[in-house]
Amino acid sequence: EELMNIEEKRLFTITIIGGSQGAKIFDNLLHQILAKVSKSIKIKIIHQTSESNQNFLINFYKENKIEHHVFVFEQDINKILNKTDLWVTRGGASSLAELSLLKVPFISIPLPSSMDNHQYENAKFYEDQNSCWIVNQKNFYKQNFEDLLLKIIKNKEEYLVKKKNLENLNYQNTWINVNQNLLSILNEN
């Protein structure tokens, strides 16, 4: 019970990472949406951006009284992962796998120009497991994204289901890998 009280007092933390191919949409639109969300729910923002946009975002979050950490590069990304409740990212396979492994629920906004739509396919795998949310950049509307964030933050039940499904997915994948390795060893002998 004490842990629950501590957890409730901590600000809901949203991390925004554009990935190696960057994400102008993350810099150009999300900060405005997050400012609106912060009017009804206190949140903390961790935001990766470009050097050219860093000061703008720092000042924006300060002016809107949003607790924040804006950075260009973070040497120890695990430090951030451990403090994050929700991740907003593209759909890179390694990023999504790492978030899955660490059981960090995420919203994926796949890069629409990715080759063979692979970022969408990566995110769709997790969505099919009911362990993430996908937002299509081509149909991105500020109000819809704001509504989604508020729903995620307020509806702890859905959020916890996604988190639990990530945990179950990793448990299943671990046993599948162990079984495949054992079969491989047995077949060699």
What would you call each of these model-derived segments?
Residues 73, 93, 111-115, 138-139:
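Short, acidic/turn-prone active-site loops that include or flank metal/cofactor-
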Residues 103, 120-132:
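Acidic, glycine-centered active-site loop in nucleotide-sugar glycosyltransferases
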Residues 89, 105-116:
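Short hydrophobic beta-strand element within catalytic cores of glycosyltransferases
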Residues 77, 95-103, 108, 122:
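Short glycine/serine-rich donor-binding loops of glycosyltransferases
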Residues 5-87, 120-123, 135-145:
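Donor-nucleotide binding loops and adjacent catalytic segments primarily
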Residues 31, 142, 146, 175-183:
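Short, amphipathic alpha-helical "lid/cap" segments that border enzyme active or binding sites
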Residues 66, 82-97, 104-105:
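Acidic donor-binding loop of glycosyltransferase active sites
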Residues 6, 133, 138-172, 188-189:
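Conserved donor-nucleotide binding/catalytic region of nucleotide-linked donor-dependent transferases
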